[in-house]
From Swiss-Prot:
Domain SH3: 472-531
GO cellular component: axon; cell cortex; cytoskeleton; dendrite; growth cone; lamellipodium; neuromuscular junction; postsynaptic density
Designated name of the protein: Drebrin-like protein
GO molecular function, one term: phosphatidylinositol-4,5-bisphosphate binding
Protein's organism: Drosophila melanogaster (Fruit fly)
Domain ADF-H: from-to ranges: 2-133
Gene: Abp1
Protein's cellular compartments: Cytoplasm, Cytoskeleton
Amino acid sequence: MAVSFEKNRAQIVAAWKDVLDDKSDTNWSLFGYEGQTNELKVVATGDGGVDELNEDLNSGKIMYAFVRIEDPKTGLNKYLLINWQGEGAPVLRKGTCANHIRDVSNLLSGAHLTINARNEDDIDLDRLLKKLSTVSSAYSFKEPRGAMEEQKAPVGTNYTRVIPTKELNASVMQDFWKKEEAEEKLRQEAEKESKRLELQKLEQEQRSREEKEHKEREKLVISTTKLQPAHVPIKTSPQPLSPEKTAPGFANNLTDAERMRQARNQEARELIGSRVGAAKAMFTKHTSEGQLQSKLNTQPPAKPARNSIAQRINVFNQNQPQDAPVPSPPRAASPAKPLPVEAPEPVVPAPAIAPAAPVAAEVVSTIAEVEESQPVDDLPLAHESEQFSTIKRSPHSKSNSLQSQSPDETTSSNETDTAVSQEQEEEVRTKVSVTVQQSQSVKSSGMSTLERNALTDLVNEDDFICQETLGDLGQRARALYDYQAADETEITFDPGDVITHIDQIDEGWWQGLGPDGTYGLFPANYVEIIN
């Protein structure tokens, strides 16, 4: 049902106008229903504002209020229409009066804002003012005006007349460019200083890093040396340590393939070491036996680099009886015609011994003068040169040749012994004269005969050793690719290098002597065999 204003319209309109009148003290009026009817009436009016209105509101009824509030910013009066629905009001009554607010707002016109309220908190003054500020313009009539604006000068222009003499002042320009140049120099110096400091910092970091790495490498080398086996490696040239295989935890991280490879390398090194040791022992044995046989069965060769002339003459006199003919053994008796057994002929000294004595005396007297002129320092040099003569092959022994002769040849040699002794006498005289001339010429040149002969023999011996060493290079191969040794058991080579003394110990890995003199393993598919 609709609301009814017929019975109390005059009182309602009078109360509404009192609130609208600015000269009236009444600033609020409250309206309600008579009993359970829809007839609207005036409940109360007052001038105490919103706080006084809250005292007359009943939480169990439906009521309407028209309020006047002064805006503190603008000083203007604002009017509110409040639709009060108490929390304790019957629900059916709320539904019935829900549509009455439209008719009431038409009667009580002039309100700036219509709000719904259910309790006293909804009618708080601050909340009402905040809602009014959102629906009204932001006026500030009562706010104090700002300070008096400063007096403004007459409107002018920024144009200034160009004065060429002032604009083109040379001194000002020079000062400007000098200032710019000084600033540029300062900037460059600051930039150089920053670069220098940065470079110094980088060098310091690099130096500290290198020192740290050097200490780590030393520790690594010490730990690796302790873990190395006790055998002596065949290779003599140093090989770079592999950082992967010298790590402290390398022994624990070996794979099966690496263990097999190391075992194979160890076995190959032991085999090569045994072969080299046996070869060295055999070479030493043969060399010592050859020297002993040469000393027992042969006379010393007449070499000026080894002995002095006086020593040669003494040896010649001592070995002269060895050149005597060997007595022929008795002939065996023939079974057909027996002959008397003849006693063996005694060993008769060669007739050349007697004439050799004056020759030796003459030679000794001649050599004595030469020996006095020679410095004493030549003797150690001759002794040192004797140490290198063991590698030389001893000359053919005369006694061996005599022993190999038949008895008939021995008999014929006895007949020619006298003639041979005379020829030896002449030969000795010739050698003495030549030696004296050589000693005098060497003395004038500033070098002794022993030094020259020792140097000549050393060169000859070195050539002989090189020929003996390079005579057998074994199986050779030429490198097709370059290879870098992974550890100390392998060799390094470049394309075109020749590898000698190759031992094909495995299908994929061979051993040989590299171009740098090291002996070790290398991959077989990196080389080709040289025929």
